[in-house]
Each structure stands twice: as structure tokens, then as C-alpha cells.
Regions:
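A generic "cationic amphipathic patch" detector
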Residues: 16-19, 30, 68-70, 129
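A short beta-strand-loop structural module common to alpha/beta enzyme folds
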Residues: 22-40
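Class I S-adenosyl-L-methionine
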Residues: 6-7, 35-36, 40-55, 61-144
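S-adenosyl-L-methionine
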Residues: 1-27
């Protein structure tokens, strides 16, 4: 069984999957992945449709985070040392976060895996932009 781990970061999913005998291909920009590239630049069609049985994606949550609202009224280098406005945050989400999410969905659509997971904090805004069917799963609902 093959797993594609997008935005692999600490490889927490991939490590466990490998221990269980799964073949894992990881993608991230951190230099520790099997494929080190910006997901927006990845030519995923080098793999055939259906190649991966499972896709696990943990897209960056920072552009969708409600915590960013605490930046309003502050000067931040990320925004060019100008005072941050709500409009700037919304524009950043649409210009940075949403394209990454759309590419993730495009990849999932292409591979059409048996299972796919898109992990992101429940309090963030990513769920407002997801176009694929999804279930909201929270480990707290299971007693953890």
C-alpha cells in the first residue's frame, strides 16, 4: 500500500506508516522529504492516476489561523514592516493559503485514493474553503 504524505514536516504520519510496512513518499520544502519542492511547483503527474492508496495532507495552517487577527495594528516584517490590517490578512490567505489548498485538492482528485486526510486546526478558516467532502474529526470526541 502506498501513502503520499504532503507537507510532511516532522514525518509523524510517514514514520508510523513505514513501521507498519507501508510504502511512503513524502513531499515538503523543509529539505527532509523524499521530494523537496513547493507543492505549487510539483509535477505530480509523473505518477500514474491511482498510484497512491492514501493521501495525507497537513497544509500550513498559518494563513488560515484565527490567531493572526492578533497581528492587526502591529508592524510585521512578513508584511513589509507596515501596520497590519484585516484586509491584508484576508488577501494573504487568498493569495498564499487558498492556492496551496486548491493544489492539494487537485492532487487528491488526480490520484483518487481510497482514503485521504486533510489535517488542520478546527478553529482555522481552511474548512471554509475546502471543496471536497469532509468529516470533521476531533480526537477529543473519542476520549483523548
Amino acid at each position: 500500500m502506498r501513502i503520499l504524505e504532503l507537507f510532511s514536516g516532522t514525518h509523524s504520519v510517514g514514520k508510523v506508516a513505514k513501521e507498519l510496512g507501508y510504502e511512503v513518499l513524502s513531499l515538503d520544502m523543509d529539505g527532509n522529504a523524499d521530494i523537496n519542492i513547493d507543492i505549487l511547483d510539483w509535477d505530480y503527474k509523473q505518477y500514474p492516476v491511482g498510484y497512491f492508496d492514501i493521501v495525507w495532507a497537513s497544509p500550513p495552517c498559518n494563513t488560515f489561523s484565527n490567531l493572526r487577527r492578533s497581528w492587526i495594528g502591529r508592524k510585521l516584517k512578513y508584511f513589509g514592516d507596515v501596520i497590519v490590517t484585516a484586509e491584508m490578512l484576508d488577501n494573504d490567505m487568498m493569495q498564499v493559503g487558498v492556492p496551496i489548498l486548491r493544489k492539494t485538492e487537485e492532487i487528491i482528485n488526480y490520484f483518487n485514493p481510497d482514503l485521504y486526510f486533510m489535517e488542520n486546526p478546527k478553529t482555522g478558516k481552511m474548512k471554509d474553503f475546502v471543496t471536497r467532502p469532509f468529516y470533521d474529526v476531533d480526537y477529543c470526541a473519542y476520549g483523548f
